A protein has these predicted regions:
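Mature exported/compartmentalized surface modules and terminal targeting/interaction regions
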Residues: 32-41, 77, 161-171
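Secretion-targeting segments and adjacent low-complexity export tracts
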Residues: 24, 64-67, 79, 132, ...
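N-terminal prepro-regions of secreted/extracellular proteins
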Residues: 1-50
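Extended, solvent-exposed segments with strong compositional bias
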Residues: 96-127
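A taxonomically broad motif for mature regions of secreted/extracellular
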Residues: 38-40, 45-48, 52, 67, ...
Length: 171
């Protein structure tokens, strides 16, 4: 009889914390990085206003989810070295949460700005250098549809032959 009472007390001592969640940690997933299913395809690039890399170029876009609930971090997967014509080019990320209908957009650079912007000759003009290399979008949780265009200044237009496209699940 004593042995069965001891076993019952031990079983009760082990199950009570589990039932009430005592000692159980909160399950969290590690952030997940992926590349959008379709990269941005730009072009044609030629002549004095083109950039190195060929007539038609691709810009893969990476997205990181799971760092914070309802947020996605976007950046170009391959950051390009500085070239003076990049001063007039940037990416625009547009997104729509398919569960809530929430929408948003943000601009970012896909190139390193190596120019000393403290010099008066290097200030003014193009504003693309002011954009960050990565942006965080407050999309909310759920499936999020993303498009990314490659835009240029002078004239203001998109030169994306095919916009980057992807669908993400944001926790």
């Amino acid at each position: 009889m004593r042995k069965s009472i001891r076993c019952g007390v031990a079983a009760l001592a082990l199950t009570v914390p589990l039932v009430f969640g005592i000692g159980a940690g909160t399950a969290t997933a590690a952030p997940q990085e992926s590349v959008l299913q379709v990269p941005v395809v730009t072009g044609p690039e030629f002549g004095p206003v083109g950039v190195p890399g060929g007539l038609i170029q691709t810009i893969p876009i990476k997205a990181t989810v799971g760092e914070k609930p309802g947020e996605v971090r976007f950046a170009a997967a391959d950051i390009r070295p500085y070239y003076y014509q990049f001063n007039y080019r940037h990416l625009t990320v547009n997104w729509r949460n398919l569960s809530t209908g929430a929408v948003g957009s943000a601009g970012l650079r896909h190139w390193i700005d190596e120019v000393d912007r403290t010099q008066p000759a290097n200030q003014g003009g193009s504003q693309a250098y002011r954009l960050p290399l990565e942006v965080t979008a407050q999309t909310g949780a759920g499936p999020v549809f993303v498009t990314v265009t490659h835009d240029r200044e002078n004239p203001d237009a998109s030169n994306a032959l095919i916009p980057g496209v992807g669908v993400l699940f944001v926790p």
